[in-house]
Amino acid sequence: MTDPKSPLILVVDDYQDAREMYAEYLQFSGFRVAEAKNGNEAVEQALALKPALILMDLSLPGMDGWEATRRLKADESTRHIPIVALTGHALAGASEGAKKAGCDSFVTKPCLPDDLVVEVRRMLNTAKPA
């Protein structure tokens, strides 16, 4: 069982299997997890829950992860939340584009569970408090 005081991670991915897989990795590592399947849900969940970190797929239906990230970083109540782009965009420049949109880090999927957890922990350790 996850400690209710452990950091809450919002996992945003339109692909249910990916969301569930990332959630399991994180829960197994001691994190609490909330999920969203598109950019609109990501913004709503982030505003309501104030997670410690957001894993954001950039290719989402409706409002994509790029726009959701821009909106969250523009909002005073969520701009401090680290956002890790979790995406299949492995093209040159995708990482830089994600950072320009406001992402704090970039992980290419598929990624190994340990690599994802290491990056989440690294970002939480370097995050500025609200």
Task: Tell me what each language-model feature is.
Residues P61, R79, L91, P110:
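The feature encodes the CheY-like receiver
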Residues E20-F28:
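Charged docking surfaces used in two-component/phosphorelay signaling
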Residues C111-V120:
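C-terminal output helix
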Residues D57, T87:
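Active-site residues of response regulator receiver
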Residues G30-K37, Q45:
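Short hydrophobic/Thr-rich beta-strand motif most characteristic of the beta2 strand and flanking loop
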Residues Y15-R19:
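Short acidic/polar segment at the start of the alpha1 helix of CheY-like receiver
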